[in-house]
A protein has these predicted regions:
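Aspartic protease
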Residues: 14-99
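Charged, flexible boundary elements
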Residues: 8-13
Length: 99
């Protein structure tokens, strides 16, 4: 799809069998989701943003569905005010910025 930027670029995603809304954030390296249970093992990670550093759980090889695309990606789970789709996932679905 082509998304204008007059409002926040939000997309519905399906992760861990749950449907969530997330912000497409080209400034974010990683995909970060609000607290949720995901299957499999995780490892601790620290990520930094405008608000400083936060501890998150890194889950690898998580199936995600976004805009009709199915991908397997790394997902970080932790305290975030907004679910964020980062460049790690957007590159997999062929997302580009065009001017």
């Amino acid at each position: 799809p082509q998304i204008t930027l007059w409002q926040r670029p939000l997309a519905k995603i399906k992760v861990g069998g749950q449907i969530k809304e997330a912000l497409l954030d080209t400034g974010a390296d990683d995909t970060v989701l609000e607290e949720m249970d995901l299957p499999g093992r995780w490892k601790p990670k620290m990520i930094g943003g405008i608000g400083g550093f936060v501890k998150v759980r890194q889950y690898d090889q998580i199936p995600i569905e976004i805009c009709g695309h199915k991908v397997i990606s790394t997902v970080l789970v932790g305290p975030t005010p907004q679910n964020i789709i980062g460049r790690n996932l957007m590159t997999q679905i062929g997302c580009t910025l065009n001017f």
